[in-house]
């Protein structure tokens, strides 16, 4: 490259709009280095709006399992919080696992509420608090001391975490239910307003099926598997912009022959695993959220003796599955399992996929 060309493409001569479009498509590691190029780059990359735009663009690459994949998996057990890259689970002979216990002050009981734009929301048992944490840039923020729970073990709280685009606000949704009662009370926490408020739109007669499972964030909504008095299985969906709950029907398979189901997120689509007695575990995806006709069966997994939840699917239809005892890969082409994916993350109690971004919990 001659001197004239080099001068033309120097940071000082690029239009700001062009420079931003280029930087928005780079991984976090590169952006961190490029902060040192010049003051204008550092200022741009440090902006809160830039971090959000960057996260939204990265979400479009969700299907890839290449080394450029911006996604990772966070796993929890009773005493440990670990993470690894999606691409290493699929492609590496040795999976590099990061341990994050020291970053989180050694807290001993984690429940991951959900992930959104690279932020991991988790609940800590010992102080009944909610935290936001970005494992990529290693920053965390305490949201609130959750007054939702008391020493009364009869109250069960189920959480969800997502982003309300209409208000530019990250929110935590809590569903509170007294044991042996059907009625559910709902509370919404706003990170912008720093307070909890009540919501009264939860449908009557609906019960969350698995209270240990957090809501699945899809397209501005949070979703839980549920049962209702009118049907065997249903989905309860909270629209964050409209601030309302409603029921969504599952695929046609989810009748009374289906004894349980789990929800997930596959390639940005709501997914559902249906277990029917004497049959396979069927994995469905809702290709257009909210449209019942768009449910499509993606695959069937035979011979399962444990409940699973798909976390990821590659272009080659190799599925990353979360079992109760760890993670496994299932190849749809030959029907083979690879288990465990890594001994370092075997025995995990919960697993969530997260995006590697620069969104800071301290800027909310």
UniProtKB/Swiss-Prot annotation:
One of its GO terms (cellular component) is nucleus. It comes from the Eukaryota. Keywords: Kelch repeat, Repeat. Kelch repeats lie at residues 169-215, 216-265. Residues 8-54 form the F-box domain. This is F-box/kelch-repeat protein At3g23880. It comes from Arabidopsis thaliana. The lineage of its organism: Eukaryota, Viridiplantae, Streptophyta, Embryophyta, Tracheophyta.
